[in-house]
Amino acid sequence: MRKIVLAVTALLLVALDQLSKFFVVKYIRLGTIVEFIPNLVSLTYLRNTGAAFSILENQQWLFTVITFIVLGVAFYYLIKQMQTQNFWLLASLLLIISGGLGNFIDRLRLGYVVDMIHLDFVDFAIFNVADSYLSVGVALLIIALWKEEKNGN
């Protein structure tokens, strides 16, 4: 049952990411800024051919290799830890897998990643839902591993 819940959750997360990108591409012109939540969040449709902060632009082969490695390692640990009672560890791996798949789908389908979320209150890169999954997933993974080590596991 746990496998089904995790698989369905991952599919829903990837679907949410892809749906958000679909709406941005359909309804916002490239480079246009649309106020979403005033003074908090704007939507800006960008095509990112690089990684976070557009580093390593146009290196699709590199991102493909890195994505396969990261997804493979995350899947391996998710399967290995499937019976664990550590919710945070499973959640972190699920978010990392979902975020990686969301951006990987873009790279395969479009040749770039659709970014759109712009935080108006801070000078920060424009990102997408999958990037959020990855960031939160990595943060949760660090916390989960730190707690495991602290508990002597």
From Swiss-Prot:
Query: Which InterPro entries does this entry report, sorted A to Z?
Result: Peptidase_A8 (IPR001872)
**Enzyme Commission no:** 3.4.23.36
Q: Where in the cell is it found?
A: Cell membrane
Its main localization is membrane
Q: How does it sit in the membrane?
A: Multi-pass membrane protein
The record lists the membrane-crossing segments as 59-79, 85-105, 126-146
UniProt keywords (A-Z) are:
Aspartyl protease, Cell membrane, Hydrolase, Membrane, Protease, Transmembrane, Transmembrane helix
Q: What pathway is this protein said to act in by its record?
A: Protein modification; lipoprotein biosynthesis (signal peptide cleavage)
Catalytic activity, reaction form: Release of signal peptides from bacterial membrane prolipoproteins. Hydrolyzes -Xaa-Yaa-Zaa-|-(S,diacylglyceryl)Cys-, in which Xaa is hydrophobic (preferably Leu), and Yaa (Ala or Ser) and Zaa (Gly or Ala) have small, neutral side chains
Keyword Hydrolase in annotation: yes
Give the highest taxon in the source lineage.
Bacteria
Question: Would I find Membrane among this entry's keywords?
Answer: yes
User: GO CC annotation: what is one?
Assistant: plasma membrane
What's an example GO BP annotation here? proteolysis
* Annotated active site: 115, 131
Query: What molecular function terms (GO) are annotated for this protein?
Result: aspartic-type endopeptidase activity
Which segment of the chain is annotated as a signal peptide?
Answer: none
Question: PANTHER family from the entry?
Answer: LIPOPROTEIN SIGNAL PEPTIDASE
Could you tell me what this protein does? This protein specifically catalyzes the removal of signal peptides from prolipoproteins.
Q: What is this protein called?
A: Lipoprotein signal peptidase
